[in-house]
């Protein structure tokens, strides 16, 4: 689904979305902001590239790092829920992953990402995706 289609649905249903981004460094928010009328459905988001902001701003529990790691389905869900609650939006979206060139501490291969979705009064879920490319291509692909 293209970003314009997402925006059209949000506008039609009068719903709002916020983003919490680690590996994509604000690209999802940027893409949402390119849509005319974005201020009607997108109040903003948080770029939490390292752990400290995930905990202090998004409310991600400390123990989640020890048990699941910073790149995991559970982390993506916690980030999405945290930003949704922080911004009081209907939906929260998050990204966390391994962009490269090094594999990082997660043990996951480069190009592994989790995209989280938190729904007000609904179920929180995350999907794992794989992108093949260099660091920049991986960030854009995940976004």
Question: For each predicted feature, which ranges?
Answer:
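Short alpha-helical segments enriched in small residues
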Residues: 1-143
């Amino acid at each position: 689904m293209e970003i314009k289609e997402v925006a059209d649905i949000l506008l039609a249903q009068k719903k709002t979305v916020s983003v919490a981004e680690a590996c994509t460094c604000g690209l999802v928010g940027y893409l949402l902001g390119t849509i005319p009328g974005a201020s009607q459905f997108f109040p903003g988001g948080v770029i939490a590239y390292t752990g400290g902001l995930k905990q202090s701003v998004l409310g991600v529990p400390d123990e989640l790092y020890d048990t699941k790691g910073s790149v995991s389905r559970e982390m993506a869900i916690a980030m999405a829920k945290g930003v949704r609650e922080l911004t009081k939006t209907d939906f929260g979206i998050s990204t966390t992953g391994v962009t490269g060139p090094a594999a990082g501490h997660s043990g996951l291969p480069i190009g592994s990402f989790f995209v989280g979705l938190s729904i007000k009064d609904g179920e929180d879920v995350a999907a794992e995706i794989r992108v093949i490319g260099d660091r920049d291509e991986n960030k854009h692909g995940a976004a």
